[in-house]
Swiss-Prot record:
Source organism, top-level taxon: Eukaryota
Regions annotated as coiled coil: none
Pfam families found in the cross-reference section: PP2 (PF14299)
Residue ranges of domain F-box in the record: 32-80
Gene: PP2B5
UniProt-listed SUPFAM superfamilies: F-box domain (SSF81383)
InterPro entries linked to this entry: F-box-like_dom_sf, PP2-like
Stated name of the protein: F-box protein PP2-B5
GO molecular function: carbohydrate binding
Biological source species: Arabidopsis thaliana (Mouse-ear cress)
Length: 284
């Protein structure tokens, strides 16, 4: 390995210029490898890393990049506030900030098991799911229409199974302070079907999302077979932009409603509701 170059440390701008000169040598065909880059140059490069995806890919470039981009100093800036991290079980111990970050990418419950949280792996943005118990579901307390069950596939203790109903109406409200500001979000209803699934194929199911008292963007959805990585299915309700911090724009409303003129003529059954998820647009 050749001798490592030095970088001018008289100021941030000078450091960057010195680092850029060294990188230019590599770009122009220098025989040196990325492992020859000095530590202070690697530190400057890592300081410009803006997303977890960037850090993960950069760590694959070389051994030196791996050491730098897997360091706690890089991954700590992707972690949410301490009160968010404190939601993880106290018994869990993490050997690095990167390990802690990826633990937060798996859903974990909060609000007495009525919500779940996780981070989007690529961006570090917050994802939230409202459980069925956090939603307003028409006649869900009546055992004639809905039955609460426990299934291993669910992240929640109980989920409602639709037995038979004419009026299908699900609504929810999310405080946008618990999701990431300055982010485009999508809302999805997460569900699965039973062998008794029926009635939805011919029912006009209208879904809407929008800020409270500011109107909803509405569309029609179908409970088709689009599967998620966790085995559930989902139907997109709509998109919104969370500006963050604006008075009067802190509550998002969602709805999934059968708007048939005569819903009693088309009974519906065979649906299990996991919840409504809010996640950054185009993420999975």
């Amino acid at each position: 390995m050749g001798q490592k170059h030095g970088v001018d440390t008289r100021g941030k701008g000078a450091e960057f210029c010195g680092c850029w000169e060294i990188l230019t040598e590599f770009i122009n065909g220098s025989s040196a490898s990325f492992d020859d880059l000095p530590d202070d140059c690697l530190a400057i490069i890592s300081s410009f890393t803006s997303t977890p995806r960037d850090a993960f890919l950069a760590a694959l470039v070389s051994k030196s990049f791996g050491l730098q981009f897997n360091s706690d100093s890089v991954w700590e800036k992707f972690l949410p506030p301490p009160d968010y991290v404190s939601l993880l079980p106290k018994s869990r111990v993490f050997s690095s900030k990167k390990e802690l970050y990826f633990a937060l990418c798996d859903p974990f419950p909060n609000h007495n098991g009525k919500m779940s949280f996780r981070l989007d792996k690529a961006s570090g943005k917050k994802c939230v799911m409202l459980s069925a118990k956090k939603l307003l579901i028409s006649r869900v307390v009546n055992p004639k229409y809905w039955k609460w069950i426990s299934i291993p596939e669910s992240r929640f203790d109980e989920v409602p199974e639709l037995l038979n109903i004419d009026s299908f109406d699900i609504r929810g409200v999310l405080n946008t302070r618990i999701i990431s500001p300055g982010t485009h979000y999508s809302a999805y209803i997460v569900y699965t079907k039973t062998s008794h699934f029926n009635g939805f194929q011919t029912s006009p199911i209208q879904a809407g999302v929008g800020f409270q008292r500011h109107g909803m963007s509405k569309t029609f959805i179908r409970f088709d077979s689009k599967k998620r990585q966790d085995g559930w299915m989902e139907a997109k309700i709509g998109d919104f932009y969370n500006e963050g911090g604006l008075i009067g724009f802190n509550l998002i409303e969602v709805s999934v409603v059968d708007v048939a003129r005569y819903p009693h003529m088309n009974m519906k059954s065979g649906l299990i509701i996991e919840g409504i998820e809010f996640r950054p647009k185009d993420s999975r």
